[in-house]
Amino acid sequence: MHIVHTIAELRQALSSSAQPAFVPTMGNLHRGHLSLLKQASTLGDCTVASIFVNRLQFLPHEDFDSYPRTWQADCDALESVHCDILFAPREHDLYPEPQRYKVMADQVLASKLEGSFRPGFFDGVCTVVLKLFNAVFAGKPKGFAVFGKKDYQQLKVIEAMTKQFALPIDIVAGETARDHDGLALSSRNGYLTAQERLKAAALYRQLLSLSQAYQTLRGDKQVAAWCLAAEHNATRRLTELGWQVDYVSVRRRVDLEPPIDSQGQPIAKDSLVVLAAAKLGQTRLIDNLEF
């Protein structure tokens, strides 16, 4: 694996690649990240991972300074899945001066759900992703970038940004990797205490229960009313189990709008996703499930 730190070094390393496949990360890698790398290896002619903890997507009270940096373990993990290039820029490599120009994420898509609890988060994500795309794909006729469905809203925002800027990059969605009890793998799971970890799979179980109950519906006209009741019930159950719930919300997969069409009619089945964010102790977890 070739490790590079500057954009110039990266472009030199990619000089013979016509279609790179890229997986951006913030490090502290787990099996979910590695599954995205394996997926990427089937797409392009060169597999690239990045490790960069992006200051712009952290709010002042969040965990930028304490976010786990596990460099050697990450390098070993990337070697194990035969990653070709690791791009590990230092902050001054991506932000050589204060970042006065930023990508403003589409507010229709980015201001809801995560965006309502983490204002500015998606602007920070889009800004660094566009910088990374420019570093990896400059001069390339085509490329691939793999993002996990676990960060579902982020995936949709990146898809929209890539389309808006007409970038020659296919955004590929990777399935969420889960632990034995269903908990979505996340770098922040390490913040959970042993007792909290035993309780953490309840978030996924509520989403799974909701999706299974949905299968009993007969006719699209029930969808809108059912969703409201299901969201309320899942929130209540999680609260009873000691969670502090930010949201449990059923949305259309395509645009994360409520499950009704422009005329106010319920939309067809099999095109929905339920998204949730909740805090257990001091650890905020997110998850989602398509159905």
Each predicted region: which residue ranges?
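Nucleotidyltransferase catalytic core that binds NTPs
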Residues: 2-243, 251, 282, 289
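Phosphate/ribose-recognition catalytic cores of enzymes acting on nucleotide-derived substrates
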Residues: 232-291
